């Protein structure tokens, strides 16, 4: 059985007791987020830098008239090298009625998970704050970290992004 077929074993649940997640890779780790927050997946493009922004906020882009902040999760989670080339991926998300782009190394698959497959997040042993986690799930021979994207791109950070993108538009 191929790796893709094994991954789809998790999709045997009815729609009522499961949710779909988009899985992606950062460094050597596998992550996933609720697919309902995904707007589109794009290649990385040049950003307009924002003065005094945290290092993980790379800047903003103009996406069909919307000014969209770009957050590099590799820097936010402190995993992997932050290189930007034609293979760099940006996942555009709808978070708190705002479009935000997140930079990842690769997008893997869509996985359907039942609530009982999701294990609670550990209080230690991960590279970032466990408040950003929905939980963990074992798929094939690795663990997938489920990210709470609304909490990760917190209202405080979105407020900072909002304030600085207004400055860019002026």
Task: Outline where the language-model segments fall.
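An acidic, low-aromatic, low-complexity terminal/linker signal
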Residues: 1-170
């Amino acid at each position: 059985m191929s790796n893709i077929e094994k991954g789809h074993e998790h999709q045997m649940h009815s729609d009522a007791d499961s949710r779909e997640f988009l899985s992606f890779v950062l460094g050597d780790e596998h992550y996933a987020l609720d697919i309902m927050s995904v707007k589109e997946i794009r290649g990385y493009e040049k950003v307009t830098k924002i003065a005094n922004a945290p290092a993980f906020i790379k800047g903003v882009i103009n996406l069909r008239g919307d000014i969209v902040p770009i957050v590099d999760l590799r820097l936010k989670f402190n995993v992997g090298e932050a290189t930007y080339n034609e293979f760099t991926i940006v996942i555009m998300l709808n978070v708190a009625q705002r479009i935000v782009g997140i930079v990842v190394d690769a997008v893997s698959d869509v996985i359907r998970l039942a609530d009982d497959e999701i294990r609670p997040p550990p209080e230690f042993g991960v590279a970032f704050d466990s408040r950003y986690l929905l939980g963990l799930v074992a798929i094939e021979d690795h663990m997938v970290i489920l990210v709470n994207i609304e909490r990760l791109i917190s209202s405080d950070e979105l407020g900072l992004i909002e304030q600085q993108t207004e400055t860019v538009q002026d």
